[in-house]
Swiss-Prot record:
It comes from Saccharomyces cerevisiae (strain ATCC 204508 / S288c). Interacts with MAK21/NOC1 and NOC3. Forms a nucleolar complex with MAK21 that binds to 90S and 66S pre-ribosomes, as well as a nuclear complex with NOC3 that binds to 66S pre-ribosomes. It comes from the Eukaryota. The lineage of its organism: Eukaryota, Fungi, Dikarya, Ascomycota, Saccharomycotina. Keywords: Nucleus, Phosphoprotein, Ribosome biogenesis. Present with 29000 molecules/cell in log phase SD medium. This is Nucleolar complex protein 2.
Amino acid sequence: MGKVSKSTKKFQSKHLKHTLDQRRKEKIQKKRIQGRRGNKTDQEKADAAGTREQQQLKKSAKEEVFKDMSVETFFEKGIEIPKENKKLKKKTTKEQSDEDSSSSEEEEDMGQSMAKLAEKDPEFYKYLEENDKDLLDFAGTNPLDGIDSQDEGEDAERNSNIEEKSEQMELEKEKIELSLKLVRKWKKQLHDSPSLKLLRNIISAFKVAVNLNKEENIEDYKYAITDEKAFHELMFMVLKDVPQAIQKMAPYKIVKGARTLPNGGNVSRVSSIVKSHAGSLLILLNDITNTETAALVLHSVNELMPYLLSYRRILKELIKSIVGVWSTTRELETQIASFAFLINTTKEFKKSMLETTLKTTYSTFIKSCRKTNMRSMPLINFQKNSAAELFGIDEVLGYQVGFEYIRQLAIHLRNTMNATTKKSSKINSAEAYKIVYNWQFCHSLDFWSRVLSFACQPEKENGSESPLRQLIYPLVQVTLGVIRLIPTPQFFPLRFYLIKSLIRLSQNSGVFIPIYPLLSEILTSTAFTKAPKKSPNLAAFDFEHNIKCTQAYLNTKIYQEGLSEQFVDLLGDYFALYCKNIAFPELVTPVIISLRRYIKTSTNVKLNKRLSTVVEKLNQNSTFIQEKRSDVEFGPTNKSEVSRFLNDVAWNKTPLGSYVAVQREVKEEKARLMRESMEEQDKERETEEAKLLNSLESDDDNEDVEMSDA
């Protein structure tokens, strides 16, 4: 007896009793319905039909055998056997006797003729006995005697047929060698008369091509590829010609700027073929090594997008793979190609793709920016800018997604602050700051500042406020909380990095953010109040690609000089935002007073010289604004006129603006020289590695030659 399945056990324990009870009730109800007057079955109606005599005969036939007598009386009378029809009996016996007599007569006649043959021609009779004895065996045979031998023959024949079929299946399973001639034949058929069968064969061969490196899967496929030319021809044909053939077989329509498939026709069958083809495209996307291949594959996927929109899982995997190419490649051109695909398809198929693309892009970006250095920073900045543009496609959806992720950042900050202040927190207070003080968290804050800067520019809004503008306040609050979490000199690089993102946000959105207090705290820290240590062997600290100062640089002269340089640059960048503002003199007056006081008490000559230059430029710009506003006839309440003040003057034509522009050029020149030196170092390292590989290969070749000589 087979094992009882789990579903059967479940039915027996829960539903069996109820089912049996229900069947009993139904049976009783059926009997009641049949017992009612007029509710007769077909058999009962047939029994009721006929004459009265026929009904009495039927009734008497159904009566019991022992009616009106006992068992003993019945056996005493004896058993009466019903009489057979004599005519029928005579007929059947006569037929049987005729058959038996005819067969026996034939046997007797045959025996007599053989006896006469033996008398007349004994030599021929002897010849028959020696060569064909079965011919003389003329006795009657039973036809059932040959059944066993016949069955054995049929079994042998059946087994041979099965063997032939299995051999045929093995022959069919033999792989088809993909030749260049076959590929070109397929290509011609694609252009002339594409069909579903042809598409299936091509896609099956393409699946073999993309899985050549996976030996465990090769045995399952119909085709085998050994010709390199056929391989390349197949790849180009599938990526270029197959999408065009699919569009011929199931053409789409453009409705409201988006490609839409009609109902009916070959759409469902073609879409199922494209669905199976998507798996090969995913493998190809994950193995992209150069820009040319990336552009070709992405173009092919773009052509097939209308046929994949109904398959949500495959669509999600495609987005994930393309975003993976966008985030992991080190080639800028490949990044641009993948970003172009994402922004074009999300604009066209906004409802189907945009939300998934935004969430996948952000999560993938955060994972990829864990390690940040001089080499990876340009690519990370490109990812930030391109992803920020994606969030501007639909600002309502961008607000929903952005609110969710900024809220997560605020929760992380709150948990960190609770861990450092409350003893009941489950997080280790000594390690809690690492949740916030890392590159991923800082890049995330900087990314959202770029998103809001891109979407909340007054020129773009044109009088209608962007929904994303509501996220500026919570983002600024989280950023300020992160800056002031640990106000020690060790994390001043992180402070500078986040201040730059706040300056960018204030510049593009027009929102005033009080940044000077964050900068002034640096001047009163131990980095400037304590006497620095000498460090002749240390290089200049890289504030652009670090958020934490190492112990080797703390309290050193070179670190202090780097802090003073960063302070002056950020101070100039911040006040350059308001260098044309009509209220600039009132804005900088407290700053000028505090800086002059600091210069009087400070003994750092280099810092004092830099601060004096900044104070001088602030005073010059303040005088410039006072001269320009002396002729205006509007008051502070007239906001439209205030916003148009000095619109015809470029920011770098002001005293402070020209100073900041020169400082930025010097800074950019230093960064360019550092990048060039880094690229030269990379090239030297690559050449050394190539030489080392060549030397190792030559050594291996020499060893092979020595072994062959031996």
